[in-house]
């Protein structure tokens, strides 16, 4: 077990954000239908997080060759540019992908594609993992509420905070 450093730098990852690093950094984010992908190398003690908002880049948005972690495909490319050693040495953890609409709101929504964005994000990310022959070491996906994620880059521990349901 690695002890928490005396000084911790707290980094809030915005939607569509990506961070890779090591040391005394704690990445935190807030998820609803978005999915957080976390890579961690337990021997080298570094990793990162992407806050994915959409399963793919819409065809109407032209890529200027810059990667954007807002989209699942781009997020994986950003990770693959950072990885050292074999991809299979990394622990991969997934969080989020909730359905953020209540039953009443779901009845009002005519655009099913908007309502199902959390599940579409989950499926897209899992397809990328399968395609790259990568395994998930842990996940907390789906459901009907937001999550706060805290990822400590000094030891790879991830804490998930969910609202209490009454």
Swiss-Prot record:
It is an enzyme of class 3 (hydrolase). Its EC number is 3.5.1.44. Pfam families: CheD. InterPro entries: CheD-like_sf, Chemorcpt_Glu_NH3ase_CheD, Cytotoxic_necrot_fac-like_cat. Keywords: Chemotaxis, Hydrolase. The keyword Hydrolase applies. It comes from the Bacteria. Disulfide bonds: none annotated. Belongs to the CheD family. This is Probable chemoreceptor glutamine deamidase CheD 1. It comes from Leptospira interrogans serogroup Icterohaemorrhagiae serovar Lai (strain 56601). The gene is cheD1.
